[in-house]
Amino acid sequence: MATIRELRDRIRSVNSTKKITKAQELIATSRITKAQGRVAAAAPYAEEIQRVLERLASASSLDHPMLREREGGKRAAVLVVTSDRGMAGGYNHNVLKKAAELEKLLAESGYEVVRYVTGKKGVDYYKFRAEDVAGTWTGFSQDPDWAATHNVRRHLIDGFTASSEGEAAWREGLNLPEGQDIQGFDQVHVVYTEFISMLTQNPVVHQLLPVEPVIEDEIFEKGEDLLSSSGEVEPDYEFEPDADTLLEALLPQYVSRRLFSIFLEAAAAESASRRNAMKSATDNATELVKDLSRVANQARQAQITQEITEIVGGAGALADSGESD
């Protein structure tokens, strides 16, 4: 059994760790609020550009490379979104597991998987396992901004536009010598953690390219008239320039904004996961201190009882010795 001094040392150590986890919990909580605010701030633009694309969908042929499913595709890019820091519970483990499942499905479908990773934890994971990574970007998982994620967005769009038969230009972050072109791909998938609530975050797969245009949760047909929720035909719009030209200009913007929204949502999910992990660690530390304190008190009581017993026994022995004299 541990001595009282050892127990007190453990209590001090656990309390010290508890202060750290509590501080991390509070920091993560404040970051969740900020991240949620950024997601909400980006929503109006995303909704408006989606609305414009819906209008264009009814007036254009939709014959655009970013919308076209390529027959006989050979290569598929997978972007795995992880965190730069740890202490986030199962956040990184879950998204890496989801990515492995996706890569297996793509390989079984005949695609060569081209892996890209954001976040230091994901980079370290694949490096430790000696698995190939075509490009890595770090330093913005908790606080993504438009400029920091520029090379990620542009490379994925350029690579898809080039297709597996063409080549995309080198960009910073790719694991190739500067200036060397990289072979393109026919699909782009993003594996990230979806923020549902403070307590729930789920790893999901989103097909970024080719774009799957959706109107009121239904895949629209080429040239289909838009109907309002009441079943009435929506007004006919005139576009200047023509709808196909506008679609050509807006689709890259839409894809860029969608990917940036994914980074923002992943940042919120990371902070929420870290907050939950740190809260659980703080609660466990509190319970452990209670248990250790109870054991220490019991040991102290036993020690005091033993000392009293020894004193009483000694006094009795002295008394008996005096009487015999």
UniProtKB/Swiss-Prot annotation:
One of its GO terms (biological process) is proton motive force-driven plasma membrane ATP synthesis. It is found in: Cell membrane. It comes from the Bacteria. It is a peripheral membrane protein. Signal peptide: none annotated. GO terms for molecular function: ATP binding; proton-transporting ATP synthase activity, rotational mechanism. Keywords: ATP synthesis, Cell membrane, CF(1), Hydrogen ion transport, Ion transport, Membrane, Transport. InterPro entries: ATP_synth_F1_ATPase_gsu, ATP_synth_F1_gsu, ATP_synth_F1_gsu_CS. One of its GO terms (cellular component) is proton-transporting ATP synthase complex. Coiled coil: none annotated. The keyword DNA repair does not apply. It holds the Pfam family ATP-synt. Belongs to the ATPase gamma chain family. NCBIfam families: ATPsyn_F1gamma, PRK05621.1-2. Produces ATP from ADP in the presence of a proton gradient across the membrane. The gamma chain is believed to be important in regulating ATPase activity and the flow of protons through the CF(0) complex. F-type ATPases have 2 components, CF(1) - the catalytic core - and CF(0) - the membrane proton channel. CF(1) has five subunits: alpha(3), beta(3), gamma(1), delta(1), epsilon(1). CF(0) has three main subunits: a, b and c. This is ATP synthase gamma chain.
